[in-house]
Amino acid sequence: MIRKILAAGFGLALMSTSALAQPEGESFADWKAGFRDRLSAAGTSDETVASMLDGLEPEMRIIESDRSQPEFVRPIWAYLEIAASDLRIRNGRDAYARNRETVDAVAAQFEVRPEILVAIWGLESSYGAIPGNNDIVQALATLAWEGRRRAWAEGELIAVGEMLDEGYATRDQLTGSWAGAMGQMQFIPSTYLERAQDWDGDGRRNIWTHEGDALASAANLLSRAGWDLGGPAILEVDLPEGFDFAAWQPHDSRPVSQWAQLGLTPARGEWSADHLMRAARLELPAGGFGPGFLTFDNFRVIKRYNNSTSYAIGVAHLADRIAGGEAFEGPWPEDNPPINRTQTRELQTALNSLGFNSGTPDGIAGPNTRAALRAFQRSRGLLADGYVGRQAYAAVMEAAGG
């Protein structure tokens, strides 16, 4: 879900709870007393304030989950093995078949592709089977008390108060991920207020147990974000021998006709007239030795749901597979996986020492790190894809004498 941490089923490696962290300073009781006043001042009714806060205690494992930073980065090919596994594809086709009338009606009303809705449903909650069972109020209250994202978490709790006061949901329905996302489509409370839908007209936006409400809510989000009905999301492409990676920019959008002039070809079939008229970016999620993808405006719409390239590729590919499409053609460079956080910090330090500014070493391979790596690669006559993998790490460390 937009603005939420990718959590339910996909991803954060949780640290051991043998040494549970506790925020320093303010006690939970003191935070709760102060927030009770802020919640009331926001217009929440006394009854709802009591239902949310009376007897509420923190859940310490949520703090551990929030603070944990996985050491190892999952390669995109490993992610896709789960996101678009044979089981998930089969379950997606079954879920679509069971709910075809609802899915198609929702897709038609909001003008989105039905298989995309089903794919998001599959990644967010395994088609409604695993929506999360954490108490959302407890989760958000714990995150607010912990303090790292207090303003955000308190804002989401105020949104919960509005949900309850408006009768959109009941207190016992408010379950989801430890990060505050709810229901079959994993909406955070503020997004729920903005985008959730009452498909069956019963007066509630039941994204927890009502498939129509859940699907319509996701469809409304995609529609409002600009989904282009009939437009593609991604297209796997082959790059020509001698492709000029040094001139490529990750966010460079140009007509597909221009990409074709640069020698790119579809991995399967031929260019369609529709493709050639659209603008697209070239994504290389595993670097220049892995599959390439042209990504279109609908790809950016998917990222409004979850701002992760792997997630967006996973949704688009799962949707295509549910619709009967084939697996990706190009092989993944499994001998050149992403490096871990410690190695990334070492890489950043080495790049800085060599005069390629990657910013303050933090172990996160962001845009500055990739740009610095590309500059290093160009200076050494290497394939300048900026992919922070094992081979690039070895080259930089050797150059730095590490």
Label for each model-derived stretch:
Residues 44-278, 287-293, 299-314, 318-341, ...:
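Catalytic glycan-binding domains that act on GlcNAc-containing polysaccharides
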Residues 7-17:
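Bacterial N-terminal signal peptides
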Residues 396-402:
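Intrinsically disordered, low-complexity Ser/Thr-rich linker and spacer segments
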Residues 28-50, 54:
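N-terminal secretory signal peptides
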Residues 19-23:
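Boundary at the C-terminal end of the N-terminal hydrophobic targeting segment
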Residues 25, 32, 63-64:
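Intrinsically disordered, serine/threonine/proline
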Residues 1-4:
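Positively charged n-region of N-terminal signal peptides that target proteins for export
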Residues 339-344, 352-395:
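Short acidic, glycine/serine/threonine-rich helix-capping segments at coil-helix boundaries
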